[in-house]
Amino acid sequence: MDENKKRALAAALGQIERQFGKGAVMRMGDHERQAIPAISTGSLGLDIALGIGGLPKGRIVEIYGPESSGKTTLTLSVIAEAQKQGATCAFVDAEHALDPDYAGKLGVNVDDLLVSQPDTGEQALEITDMLVRSNAVDVIIVDSVAALVPKAEIEGEMGDAHVGLQARLMSQALRKITGNIKNANCLVIFINQIRMKIGVMFGNPETTTGGNALKFYASVRLDIRRTGAVKEGDEVVGSETRVKVVKNKVSPPFRQAEFQILYGKGIYRTGEIIDLGVQLGLVEKSGAWYSYQGSKIGQGKANAAKYLEDNPEIGSVLEKTIRDQLLAKSGPVKADAEEVADAEAD
């Protein structure tokens, strides 16, 4: 850069700092790059698919899927993992369907969980914004976007047309809270439902509720589906679940993870550790027997997983080894370089 341009830039930067304060414009090279902090989802495979070991803090995340696919279970699992790290969590229950007993079975400390059951969509989003701006809450779940009913619709007659009201509400709210979320380093997860577009002949007829704003503002979007049943004999005890990362601004997208959700217990984490351990050669499988470091740990996956539950120190060592190996291949994006990519994408 020639001297005239340097002087002009220095004058512009000086004027900006006087008007907007120090740090309004920064040179990226002046600060050390830091990896984006993440909160585990409770699923080892999904943490690895996300590329940074979990869901990114200071960002908006959308989780959507059909009914009974595991959306709320996954978010409660995120809360349980965050609380283990001492985080403060809040659940904005717009659907009025949160079951404290079920949340407790998944490992959530229900006594410390902040819960709100708002009357209108405006109230729900205002509460979310105030919690974010407090800088004291680390994780906020909004369940769900479809239940964020505008005040005008609640006060109107049944059958009245309210075209675009919810989409406008979401667009305005997200414009307002996105910057606050980044400053507070808070993870905000919106659960969303699926609807069908009428008259779509080709392509995917599925869409999510609440307009397009959330699709743009979300740094991560997860599509969760139930792919089958987990049975013990004839009894169904859980569901096979597949999660696809359909958007990811912090790591390469379109990866997917498969795991089991057991009813009343949550994500079958030890089963995932066994599967990934076999895949990486850390756990040896010979016929139906599983061995770890030369010692047999069980006949059949269920018994091997039970061994890890009974010996948590071995399970945690194995999990850490799997994380270190697979996340090193993923190559997490550094925070400041990623911000530039965001700006270019938007």
Curated annotation (Swiss-Prot):
Signal peptide: none annotated. InterPro entries: AAA+_ATPase, DNA_recomb/repair_RecA, DNA_recomb/repair_RecA_CS, P-loop_NTPase, RecA-like_C, RecA-like_N, RecA_ATP-bd, RecA_C_sf. One of its GO terms (biological process) is DNA recombination. GO terms for cellular component: cytoplasm. One of its GO terms (molecular function) is ATP binding. The gene is recA. This is Protein RecA. Disulfide bonds: none annotated. The keyword Nucleotide-binding applies. Keywords: ATP-binding, Cytoplasm, DNA damage, DNA recombination, DNA repair, DNA-binding, Nucleotide-binding, SOS response. The keyword Transferase does not apply. ATP binds at residues 65-72. CDD domains: RecA. It is found in: Cytoplasm. It comes from Pseudomonas aeruginosa (strain ATCC 15692 / DSM 22644 / CIP 104116 / JCM 14847 / LMG 12228 / 1C / PRS 101 / PAO1). Belongs to the RecA family. Can catalyze the hydrolysis of ATP in the presence of single-stranded DNA, the ATP-dependent uptake of single-stranded DNA by duplex DNA, and the ATP-dependent hybridization of homologous single-stranded DNAs. It interacts with LexA causing its activation and leading to its autocatalytic cleavage.
